[in-house]
Swiss-Prot record:
Family of the protein in this entry: Belongs to the Tim17/Tim22/Tim23 family.
Main localization of the protein described in the UniProt heading: mitochondrion
Function per UniProt: Essential component of the TIM17:23 complex, a complex that mediates the translocation of transit peptide-containing proteins across the mitochondrial inner membrane. Links the inner and outer membranes.
Keyword ATP-binding attached: no
Designated name of the protein: Mitochondrial import inner membrane translocase subunit TIM17-3
Subcellular location(s) per record: Mitochondrion inner membrane
Amino acid sequence: MDTKKKSKEHGLYRIVNAIGYAFGAGAVGGSVYHFVRGAYNSPIGARYVGGTQAASMNAPRLGGTFAVFGGLLSTFDYALVRIRKKEDPWNSIVAGAATGGVLSIRKGVVAASTSAVMFGFFLAVLNPPFGSK
């Protein structure tokens, strides 16, 4: 029997799923962070209100930022899976580098290349390409 390892999920489902998870992670983490920060920066009698207001104003924005990152990363990852016809850690490493470069291209070529190297390195640490199987 010839069984090839196929992609776990269809491309669009995979990308939309990553966007949703990234938005949720950013919104929850942003809510906690901005609540604590807002409560700390509020006067003594209004700490709860200040924290709630800061979280409700800033958490969706951070969730959206995470969603863009997750969507680009997943899109590049799926594109590499389709081009290379295999799933391995190199896809996520290159996708992370491409995502880092695209997200910081507005700051110039030097910043984009630095960001690409850093994101690629970060994903190489998370998904080591060489190791035990």
